Each structure stands twice: as structure tokens, then as C-alpha cells.
Amino acid sequence: MGTEKTQPLTLICHGESPKFYEIDFDLDGLRVHHFNPDIEWAMFVAWNRRVIPERFRSHYDEKFLPIARSSDVIAGKIANDRMVVVLDWFFNGFITDVGLLMSLQALGLGDQYCALTPEACSHAKVVSEKALSANECANLRAKSENQRSLAVKMVDRIRLEHRRDGIFFSEIIEQETGRAWT
């Protein structure tokens, strides 16, 4: 669930019989942890995607499990098909934290919400449902590819402009855990 309508549309357009659901998600009474668009958010994404090497996992388990266990909803910037390229570059040492954060800001992503508990799920109500035609899906796929291409060019420019600014993913892990990467 998210605030940016295009994000789920470009994902579902690859399915056989895609349907788009508009959802009303009432957060009142729920325990919501909202990640700011910062390095903690990126490290949470890395932890969830199991990108953090196993030898460092326990540190991040101690950091993020309490957040996940005490929340009905986790919210943060959408890690969509445009952002996944940037995240991969960050996780693989092609850009620093400065490049990542500048890219995150430049991409202008909406927020996404993950309902973690039955209570949170009960707060989500389907408002409308729309089946997508083959033509709509083709247009969405083309739009998605175009957006991804433009995003990669923009992020590559940011990467080059800030290649000496900040620290890399492995260095963040070293600093946070007090252990050497190698």
C-alpha cells in the first residue's frame, strides 16, 4: 500500500489478469513506525532483503526486530523499480550514503505502508477495483521502462558528482557493528 499510484500499477501490469485496488488505510489506533528517508531506512531495507552479510546480521536483528515486533505498520519511502537500482548500487559499493540520499530525494518517491498484524490488516478497506486492459498494461510497462531509464541516468549523474562524498555500505556496517568488513 502506498501514496504513489504509479508504483503498484507498473508492478501489476506484468501479471495475467491485473487488477488495481484503491485502498483506504486508517492508521488511527495503530502502532506505526515511520522511517525517515535516511540511512536507517536503507539499512532496514537491506536487513529485510537479507543483503547484510550473515556475520553482521545479529547487530541488525537487535536493532530492527524490536521495531518490527512493536509495530502494526511499517512506513517509509517506496523501494520501487526506480529505487531498487539505486539501492543495489549502494549495497554493492557503487555509490555512497550521500549519493543514495541525494538520489532518494531527487526521485521524489511516495511512501509505502506494510501492515504487519491482523489488527493493521483490518484497518485496510478496498474502496475500488479496476481491471487493467492489455493496452493499459502495455502503456504502463513502457512508462515504467522510461521512468527507470531516466532515473538511472539521473542517479548516475548524482553518483559521479558525489563519488568522493560520504561513506559506503560496508563502511556503515563496520562503523555500526565495530567489526571489520573482511
Describe every region a protein language model picked out.
Residues H14-K19, L27-T182:
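Conserved NAD+-utilizing ADP-ribose enzyme module
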Residues M1-C13:
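Extended catalytic/binding region for NAD+/ADP-ribose chemistry, centered on the ART fold
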Residues E22:
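Surface-exposed, glycine/proline- and aromatic-rich loop segments on solvent-exposed faces
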